[in-house]
Amino acid sequence: MAYPFQLGLQDATSPIMEELMNFHDHTLMIVFLISSLVLYIISLMLTTKLTHTSTMDAQEVETIWTILPAVILILIALPSLRILYMMDEINNPVLTVKTMGHQWYWSYEYTDYEDLCFDSYMIPTNDLKPGELRLLEVDNRVVLPMELPIRMLISSEDVLHSWAVPSLGLKTDAIPGRLNQATVTSNRPGLYYGQCSEICGSNHSFMPIVLEMVPLKNFENWSASMI
């Protein structure tokens, strides 16, 4: 989860988020090198006497500044396309959870179970217990097994919403009349917080998401107690 005054990304909890963080560092390094080169050239122009001001044609230079940006764009595009493919690929999910956005709460349905469904509302500030997080706690958490691929089907009952959990690298739009899907895989147990990430009305800020990732045995016990 996020911490006060945090400047970086949240700690990665899923393979997808780890790949996204690596891609972020890779792209940022390229941007830093390009910025350094541009600043160096500008400093040279400002501190040295200008030469070749009347040059009308320089094919060698034009070739370089055409090919070099193309190579840089390819170096950025290839890992990006790889991650996009990984995010869309779902191989044999062990569980499917249907998520519906409402104004202003989420509802969840475990489609592999006959009667396992519930609504998830934010806990008001006045009802919080010591140690709980303001605007992030819910009355019903989404309990899921860790280290297993889980398919999330995401849609909306009314307006546009967006189901997002940053530490898992998840952000999927909830669109009325359309079913989007995302893959959830957690490397370790814990509580992972998210929020609606699409402006959806006056209480948009009061639609938190809480995933509780537990070992498979604990999940089986929880699901048996809920049915």
From Swiss-Prot:
Membrane topology: Multi-pass membrane protein
Mitochondrial matrix topological domain residue ranges: 46-59
Transmembrane regions listed in the UniProt entry: 15-45, 60-87
GO molecular function, one term: copper ion binding
Location in or out of the cell: Mitochondrion inner membrane
Topological domains, Mitochondrial intermembrane: 1-14, 88-227
Claim: Transmembrane is one of the keywords in the record: yes
Catalyzed reactions: 4 Fe(II)-[cytochrome c] + O2 + 8 H(+)(in) = 4 Fe(III)-[cytochrome c] + 2 H2O + 4 H(+)(out)
GO CC terms: mitochondrial inner membrane; respiratory chain complex IV
Record's cofactor remark: Binds a dinuclear copper A center per subunit.
Annotated residues for binding of Cu cation A2: C196, E198, C200, H204
Function: Component of the cytochrome c oxidase, the last enzyme in the mitochondrial electron transport chain which drives oxidative phosphorylation. The respiratory chain contains 3 multisubunit complexes succinate dehydrogenase (complex II, CII), ubiquinol-cytochrome c oxidoreductase (cytochrome b-c1 complex, complex III, CIII) and cytochrome c oxidase (complex IV, CIV), that cooperate to transfer electrons derived from NADH and succinate to molecular oxygen, creating an electrochemical gradient over the inner membrane that drives transmembrane transport and the ATP synthase.
Protein name: Cytochrome c oxidase subunit 2
Organism per entry: Maxomys bartelsii (Bartels's Javan maxomys)
